[in-house]
Amino acid sequence: MKFFLNIFSMCTILSFLVVFEAIGNDLDQVICKAMKGMQSQEEKKIPYNIGDYELLRIAVDCEKKALITEKKHIQYSLSDFPQDFKINATKNWKKANCKNMIFNTNTGWSTTQIIKDTNKKVVLKLEANFEICSQ
């Protein structure tokens, strides 16, 4: 959770920088540069533990305007996740990311998190973007 709050904080700060820099620059280039900077910093730490999870990957695809993170649970296999996991995780993901202007305005950017079990089987894929945040 700390990692995602860290990413959220960085994105919030970067979004303010984006607004000021975007006056003279193309917004997509500014967002891409900020995201790539964050990716570079976080990749130095991978793999590392975030509570019950291990961060496996962080990627920025500027062409697709996407931030992608991938993590796996340290102990749970697919059948060990609680039944309400998907509902709670989706609610928390949307709440955390839809506050960010990069994802709650029509920039075209999205953030995706892929959650895997201890065997690296996909448990859930979460996304936040303008369309999702507008609901």
What spans do the regions from the language model cover?
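Classical Sec-dependent N-terminal signal peptides that target proteins to the secretory pathway
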Residues: 1-24
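Short, intrinsically disordered, charge-biased short linear motifs at domain edges
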Residues: 18, 82-88, 116-123
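N-terminal low-complexity, Pro/Thr/Ser-rich intrinsically disordered segments
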Residues: 22-36
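Polar/charged, Gly/Pro-rich intrinsically disordered segments
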Residues: 27-28, 39-67, 72-76, 103-135
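Short, non-transmembrane alpha-helical segments in secretory-pathway proteins
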Residues: 37-39, 92
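Short, non-transmembrane amphipathic alpha-helical segments
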Residues: 81-105
